[in-house]
C-alpha cells in the first residue's frame, strides 16, 4: 500500500539512476570499447563517407550517445516512478484515460496540493484554517485548508490530536489574520501543548475545567439570564426565557417515557426557579446560581402545590405542574427524586464554586483575541450535559453579539475545534447553529470517531449538520457504515484491461488483442477500513479527494514553535509545558435559603414560571 508520508522525489531519483547508468557506461568504455573501437570506427567512417561527410571521431560519438542515453533512461525511470505513485489510485488498479465509468482521482502531487491549500512554511505566519497535513516527509511545510465548517473522522489512535488538532491550534495562534479559538479538549492535551504559546502571543486564555474545578476559570450558567433581568450588557428582560430554555432543555434530560409530562413539568419548574433566582430582589447577587436553583427545586410537595395554585388558571404551566404537585405522594416522590438527581451534580461542592461566578463571557470574543479551552472527563458523563449547555450558550451568544454589536459578523473569526463532539448529549438547535453562525464568522470543526456517532445522537437532524460541512478529513474508521458512505461518495474511475490471445494452425498462427473497460471504486469500503495514519490523510473537499502526509506534531516545525524540539510530548513533557494555574475554587457556592412559608414568594415564583413560558415549544 502507498504511504503519502514518504513521496517519490524525481530529482534525487533521477540523480541515483543517472549515477548507476554512468557507472555502467564507464565500465563499458574501459572494458569493452577498446576491442570494438577499430571496427566501429571503420564502419562509422565508411558510412560517413557514403553520405559525403568527413572523418568521424568514434570516441566523441560514443561518449555523446552514452551520456544522452544515460540521461534519457534515468529521466524516464524517475518520471515513471513519480507518475506511477501519483496515478490517482491508492489500492486499486491504474486508472484509464477513458471516462466511461467515471473519472474519480486522488490528487496527491505536491504541486497540486500547494495550489489547492495554503502552505504554512517555517518562519512565516500561517493563514487561518485547519491544518490538514503536510507535504511528504518535509517538516518545514504544512497544508492549511481555509474551511467554513469541517468534519474530522478518526478512531482511537488515529492521531487526531497530534497530526491535526494541535497543529491547527498552533496555526490559529500564529495566524497572520488575528482569530480566536473555542476548543473542546476532553483530556486537556491541547491546553497543555498550546496555552502557554497562546498567552505569549497576547491572547486571553480561558480554561473551563469540568474535570478539576479547583483551578478552573469561573462560568456562571445563569449569567445571561441575570444580564437580561438587569438589562445590562446589551440584554433585555424579554430575552431571559430563551436563555433559560437553553439550560432547561440540556440540563433536564428527556426520560423518553410514554408520556412526556414528567420531563415537561421538571423543565417548567426548573425554568421558573431559574428565572426567579436570576431576577428576584430577594436573592443576593452572590446566591444567583444553580446551587440555589437546586435547593429550591427540592421543595416539599405542599410548597409546590401552593406555587401551582398561584399560576393562571388554564395555563399550560399550571396544567403540567398540577399533574405533579397534586399527584399521590409516592408519585411526587419519584418526580422529586429524578429532578434532584438531575440538578445535584451542579450543586455538588466539588463543582459549584466554579459555577458561582463568571471569569469569562462569550462577549469577550468581540473585544479581543480569546483562546477558550473546555476540559471535561471523557470517562464520566456526570457533567456532560453542563458541557453541552456551555457550548449552546456560547454559540447563541456569539450569534447575538455578531448581529447586534458587530454588523452581523464578529471582528475576528472564531474557530471551534470540537473534539469528542458526538460523545456529548445532544445540543438543541445545533443544525441551526452550523448554518447560521458561519455567517457571523464562526467556523466549526467537528471531531468524531465515525459518522454513526453523530447520527445516533442527532438522528433526523444529522443530515442538516452534514450538509453544512464543506470539508471532511478522513483519518481512519472501523465503522462499516462510515466506510461504505465514503466509498460511495468518493466515486469510481475507469480501468482498462487488455487481453492477448493466440491461435495456432497446422501451418499458420494468429494473435488478437481485446480491450475491455470496467468500473473500479476509488476506495472500496475494505480499503477505507485499512486506511490509517501510516497511509496519510484523506481530504474530501468540494467534490475532490486529496491525499497528504500525516506527520505528528513533533516531526514538524509547528512542534518546534512550542518547544518540543523533535521529541514526542509524553506525560512528563505535557506537565512541564502546562501553565501554572492557582487554586481558586475552594468554597461551595453560596445558597439562598428559603423556608417555604412566604406567600409573597409563592406568587413571585409563580410569576417567574408564567413569564418563562413552556420550554417544550422552543
Predicted feature descriptions by range:
Residues 23, 105, 126, 132, ...:
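Polar low-complexity intrinsically disordered regions enriched in Ser/Thr and small residues
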Residues 434-436, 440-538:
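Conserved ATP-driven motor cores of ASCE-family P-loop NTPases powering translocation/secretion/packaging/pilus
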Residues 141-442, 457, 526-547, 551-555, ...:
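P-loop NTPase motor domains
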Residues 39, 43-50, 240, 299-300, ...:
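Short, solvent-exposed helix-helix connector turns and helix-capping sites enriched
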Residues 117-123, 231-235, 252-259, 283, ...:
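Low-complexity, polar-biased intrinsically disordered regions enriched in Pro/Ser/Thr/Gly
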Residues 1-158, 162-170, 175-177, 214, ...:
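Basic- and hydrophobic-enriched, low-structure N-terminal and domain-boundary segments
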Residues 122-137, 313-330, 495-499:
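N-terminal short leaders/motifs
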